[in-house]
Amino acid sequence: FKETGGILATRRNFVTETSRLGLNIDLIEISREESVEINTYEDWWIANNYLRKMKIAFVVDAYDQIGTGHMYRCLSMASKLVFHDVVFFINRNHQLGIDIIEGYNYKYQTYEGKSDLLGLFEHFNPKIVINDVGNTSYDYMVDLTSRGYYIINFEDFGSGSDLADLVFDSLYEHESDDKFFVGHEYYILKDEFYLHQPKIITNDVRNVLIDFAPNDTLNLSQKVLDALLASGFSGRINVILGSGHENYDELVSKYEFMKNVQFYTTVESISDFMISADIIFTSGGRIMYQVCSLGVPCIVICKNEREERTLFGSPEHGFVNMGMGSYLSQEDIIEQFNIVANDFELRQ
């Protein structure tokens, strides 16, 4: 055996002029973090980062009814936490979320029910728990706070939100206390949008994007598409339906003979579709921030009353907001489209 500078435990009677090793020798293996030996400033930097390293749990889901926005927001946050131990916790019944996380180099665990999730937390012992699952229950949050976790929630209007240490809500601005951070300033933009320059507005409108995914319960995709076709628009129309659209087969079969209409269930990079569009029809959800970041002219049609309450989708931020989609006629949509399409200065 050869001494390597590590910590050596021995007995007094084994210490001689030529050796400190006895006959019964064993090695105690330590972790990489514990084995850092500080000899240089670089070693000191590494050791300092190990000491600051935290265990962070992301509780997040993605499925047809809620889409993938929650998952990609957490992935964006995780990409900035490279010096910490990050683990995603995903409901095993939501395969879409599992499929997404498997495409990234992050550890994840699946659970079924609250008790299963809390058991995984007991083993992982996170310092911070980030919930991006919408509304949380009071009982769930009590279980987390009783374990001493620091809790951060996103877009939580549930009964458990008051027990969180921080709550971020970029979409629905409202009066709140000091631990609630609301407004568009707190929206986390997907990394792909930083790769694009702002849209260059042209005189002609040749490409329209329709995106009411993932939960188009009012079938606004077809309503807008029918209006565009009735208006005489002959340019390209891309329609993103999402993987869970109930009328997908019906829509495709109805319009498959039209060469200028293309349907998509999922897309690799939504920003590419947006930047290529001259006008976008979409809902009053988080997608508004993505459109705004690119500067593409946008007509907002709300899918529910909650979207109607959002303050961001207004002319002040460059949007034409038509309100609740269920109240709009085809003529209303045609009229508004023609106004936007024919007014170059308005689109600028």
Regions found by a protein language model. Give the residues of each.
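Donor-nucleotide binding loops and adjacent catalytic segments primarily
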Residues: H94, R206-S276
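Active-site donor-binding acidic/aromatic loop of nucleotide-activated sugar
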Residues: Y111, K259-T266, N321-M324
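Conserved donor-nucleotide binding/catalytic region of nucleotide-linked donor-dependent transferases
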Residues: G325-Q348
